[in-house]
UniProtKB/Swiss-Prot annotation:
This is Methylenetetrahydrofolate--tRNA-(uracil-5-)-methyltransferase TrmFO. Belongs to the MnmG family. TrmFO subfamily. It catalyses: uridine(54) in tRNA + (6R)-5,10-methylene-5,6,7,8-tetrahydrofolate + NADH + H(+) = 5-methyluridine(54) in tRNA + (6S)-5,6,7,8-tetrahydrofolate + NAD(+); uridine(54) in tRNA + (6R)-5,10-methylene-5,6,7,8-tetrahydrofolate + NADPH + H(+) = 5-methyluridine(54) in tRNA + (6S)-5,6,7,8-tetrahydrofolate + NADP(+). GO terms for cellular component: cytosol. InterPro entries: FAD/NAD-bd_sf, MnmG-rel, MnmG-rel_CS, MnmG_N, TrmFO. It comes from Streptococcus sanguinis (strain SK36). Keywords: Cytoplasm, FAD, Flavoprotein, Methyltransferase, NAD, NADP, Transferase, tRNA processing. It is found in: Cytoplasm.
Length: 444
């Protein structure tokens, strides 16, 4: 192809990463982003890589698969990880970021790159003038989504995703909550609102009977387990939340706790955790409380949480439909289209699930778009690495049962030899091997 540049459509986590990876390899990029001229119901700004759900990039330890993926991306010079490290906020053993500061830094680093031209306009056709990376995300505009679905034989996959409410910290009653990380991992980074059994039962009853906002679609509700609305979880059973976001283990009462408790128990019956959402520490989100309740119902029900009786919600929870492709049939392991060889896809639309995973797919697609431009061989990362196993999974899964996938040790190639029974030791060995196997790929 004679074109002198590569198109990247969408400046979310995947698109920003793809554009950066292409530009750092000396190739001009035209980066298209419609926000700024056309907004979406979920985005609040026109900044790149805006986080519309949680502000956490999840676990940071190498014994956690997403922690391993992040370390691999750091070594591959990821602009997303660079920005996350610079804007991190306390979150125990997790990597959480100042939501606005993070997006602003990504925007700045990408926009200021001399080889990246940012064009604020909506793209409604799949370009054929140059090698193109489509990274328009789960909130792809209808016009472009139709073209992508046509590639898929007209079958659009989808699932629903939700975001948790954010609260002004000054409106939390600090006498009813305590600062602690689960099992005291890292610094004490979460505010914990404990509940007695009766408080939990009353809360559960209110939650399952609260009125939900209507969906904008006639299609059947289908949720990704990692971002399930709290009310849907509650309806699965009275104790379901106690094994999920309201799990009390490792969150014992502090010695000076004076509030209500069940007898002499050292651990609450249930706990709601709040996590810092910005660097200033003025905003906190309710961890795991993604929701699609009507806003008035959110206020009524969530103010039943101890300490939140007078809480001011600076953002209510919202839900949106996420589209994803039939990647096993449509994409190569490099995220290159099998049908249109100059086209790459990246981000959640490929069936990777999660912020870090989306950025990782952008990194892989960007590197390979650049290599195609230069006439070089495709770069397929080994399945012994997190960044190699995830693209392999989404492009080799059973198409009939394909669902979005987070990175996890189950999709990374097993260690040779007898299985190590101790999980922590096994994961440490997998991580050690992954980083060794990644080494030869770092300068490509």
């Amino acid at each position: 192809m004679s074109s002198s540049y590569i198109n990247v459509i969408g400046a979310g986590l995947a698109g920003s990463e793809a554009a950066y990876q292409i530009a750092k390899r000396g190739i001009p990029v035209k980066l298209y982003e419609m926000r700024g001229v056309k907004s979406t119901p979920q985005h609040k700004t026109a900044d790149f890589a805006e986080l519309v759900c949680s502000n956490s990039l999840r676990g940071d330890a190498l014994t956690n698969a997403v922690g391993l993926l992040k370390e691999e991306m750091r070594r591959l010079d990821s602009v997303i990880l660079k920005s996350a490290e610079a804007t991190r906020v306390p979150a125990g053993g997790a990597l959480a970021v100042d939501r606005e500061g993070f997006s602003q830094m990504v925007t700045e680093l990408v926009t200021n790159h001399p080889l990246i031209e940012v064009i604020r306009e909506e793209i409604t056709e799949i370009p054929e003038d140059a090698i193109t990376v489509i990274a328009t995300g789960p909130l792809t505009s209808d016009a472009l989504a139709e073209k992508i679905h046509a590639l898929n034989g007209g079958d659009g996959f989808y699932f629903y995703d939700a975001a948790a409410p954010i609260i002004d910290v000054n409106t939390i009653d600090m006498t009813k909550v305590y600062l602690k990380s689960r099992y005291d991992k890292g610094e004490a980074a979460y505010l914990n609102a404990p509940m007695t059994k009766q408080e939990f039962m009353d809360f559960h009853d209110a939650l399952v009977n609260a009125e939900e906002a209507p969906l904008n679609s006639f299609e059947k509700e289908k949720y990704f387990e990692g971002c399930m609305p709290i009310e849907v979880m509650a309806k699965r059973g009275i104790k379901t939340m106690l094994y999920g976001p309201m799990k009390p283990v490792g969150l014992e009462y502090p010695d000076d706790y004076q509030g209500p408790r069940d007898g002499e128990y050292k651990t609450p019956y249930a706990v709601v955790q709040l996590r810092q959402d910005n660097a200033a520490g003025s905003l906190y989100n309710i961890v795991g409380f993604q929701t699609h309740l009507k806003w008035g119902e959110q206020k009524r029900v969530f103010q039943m949480i101890p300490g939140l009786e007078n809480a001011e919600f600076v953002r209510y929870g919202v839900m949106h439909r996420n589209s994803y492709m039939d990647s096993p049939n449509l994409l190569e392991q490099t995220f290159r289209s099998k049908k249109l060889p100059n086209l790459f896809f990246a981000g959640q639309m490929t069936g990777v699930e999660g912020y870090v995973e989306s950025a990782a797919s952008g990194l892989v697609a960007g590197i390979n778009a650049a290599r195609l431009f230069k006439g070089e061989e495709a770069l397929v990362f080994p399945e012994t690495t997190a960044i190699g196993s995830l693209p392999h999974y989404v492009t080799h899964a059973d198409s009939k049962h394909f669902q979005p996938m987070n990175v996890n040790f189950g999709i990374i190639k097993e260690l040779d030899g007898p299985r190590i029974r101790d999980k922590k030791e096994r994961y440490e060995k997998i991580a050690e091997r992954a980083l060794q196997d990644l080494q030869p790929y770092l300068d490509k």
